[in-house]
Curated annotation (Swiss-Prot):
The system is composed of three essential subunits: KdpA, KdpB and KdpC. Keywords: Cell inner membrane, Cell membrane, Ion transport, Membrane, Potassium, Potassium transport, Transmembrane, Transmembrane helix, Transport. Part of the high-affinity ATP-driven potassium transport (or Kdp) system, which catalyzes the hydrolysis of ATP coupled with the electrogenic transport of potassium into the cytoplasm. This subunit binds the periplasmic potassium ions and delivers the ions to the membrane domain of KdpB through an intramembrane tunnel. HAMAP family: KdpA. This is Potassium-transporting ATPase potassium-binding subunit. The keyword Protein biosynthesis does not apply. PANTHER family: POTASSIUM-TRANSPORTING ATPASE A CHAIN, POTASSIUM-TRANSPORTING ATPASE POTASSIUM-BINDING SUBUNIT. One of its GO terms (cellular component) is plasma membrane. It is a multi-pass membrane protein. Belongs to the KdpA family. Pfam families: KdpA. It comes from Delftia acidovorans (strain DSM 14801 / SPH-1). One of its GO terms (molecular function) is potassium ion binding. InterPro entries: KdpA.
Amino acid sequence: MWLTWMEYALVLLLMTALAVPMGQWLARCFTSEHHAWIERLSFRALGVNPAERMGWQRYGLALLLSNGAMLLLGYALLRAQGWLPLNALGNAAQTPDLAFNTAASFVTNTNWQAYSGESSLSNATQMVAITFMMFAGAITGVVAAAGFIRGLARSSASDLGNYWVDYVRVLWRVMLPLSFVVALVYVWQGVPQALDGQVWATTLEGARQQILLGPVASLESIKHIGTNGGGFFGMNAAHPFENPTPLTNAIHILGMLLIPSAMTYAFGSMLLRRRQGWVLFGACLVMFVGFLALVFTAEQAGNPLLTAAGADQQISATQPGGNMEGKELRFGIADTALFVATTTAATTGSVNAMHDSLTPLGGLVPLAQMMINCVFGGDGVGLINLLQYAILTVFLAGMMIGRTPEFLGKKIEAREIKLVMLAVMAHPISVLGFTALAAVWPDTLASLANRGPHGFSEVLYAYASGTANNGSAFAGLNANTPFFNTTIGLAMLAGRYLTLLPMLALAGSLAAKPTVPAGPGTFPTATPLFMGLLVFVVVVVGGLTFLPSLALGPVVEQLQMLSGQVYP
């Protein structure tokens, strides 16, 4: 057992060590006045004036229009798959509702998949549509965070920078170099990178077996660096071609956490308040460790119903013990629990086990992290979501002591709190609203593999995953229906843009305000006390908002499991 905790500690130490240089590089990308030659070529090709400055309205409009154009392009490619080359299996085009769902999924950095990649998409579609939108979605989140940080850093300013400059820089300086290096490591470890759609092998019994291949390593690298999560294969990171060795599993985990953790350091560096960045990092780390401990202990404890049936769930020299249903033996409980906590903390959605097979308490962890949506979070957007809670914390503290709240030298007034609450409320309204609609929709029961509280959890998980732009699933739900493709697609769009746009408006409002020096009545935010308050507000606000739905799903399922009740 102690080896497991040493492994967890080592991973977290590596993440912390990598966050510093990565954060410094991100801050340099966001603040540098120099443009590389390839960036200047990109500006000329796009017709962009890099010296132009954009207010929050134009910054947000550029974000929306670029994402909208890429969504339409992705949709067109998915609908035209039958005419594209490199389609050795002759895969047909996706249906209109599935193509909408897939395009919305990947452009919003969600990567929800209502299809199985290796049997539904051609290699051309995987490269030109899917991998392209993986880059687009990840870069958009980081760029939005850059604009938001500038809003806090600037005083009496009218702009948040230039969206196109930020986009091009993040592409050429961050995403492409990192993805290229990681892809080479994956190829070295045995991840395929080929244009052949299939090879045939002869098994030990003499039978002929078809093995599907493709450009897996290039997709796999941006999948985790960009907190995307969509798999080339339906089994995702549980497939040996996506995750063949312990080293690739560790790189997957560190890749998911790299940019989200580094964004807190970049935030502190750009504001010249590095202690503030470490406080935000510490808040994320505290929540992450708590959720990791919960999912590990829940899964290692096993299922009492199986124990009553005579199954041996104890750790021994020949088995890892615990609840091994839906898990890879090569990963066991420890690496599976770490992956579960990481993929939903960083809103990646990649999986190396079936979340639907977790114990009720273990399954509550990914649900809760997606509902909170700021335990490190996705590339860029995780920091934005955390900062909205930080501003809310300052506001609540200011109200308790009877002073106008301030955050980083900016007064937080009625307009700012209204914008924060718009962003905060958009998330639960989407999750709970669509879940309620699905609960009364006549065809929902036909899509459920389970009845009772777990069936409800499958639906709740789908909309929490879509709205949080996570993409993982309780796979007992058949989501490839017109109803689920449409509503989950809308949930992904709502979760992305109905939170980003109010926060960009907030950044514009704060940028226009002068920065005032801290006074004797200013509530300090770069302290362990504020970190504790921030964690408290995140957990309480998230808990109170979603507690009734969690009580109907995993909580009651856990109680029934402990009492020996099962559903047919």
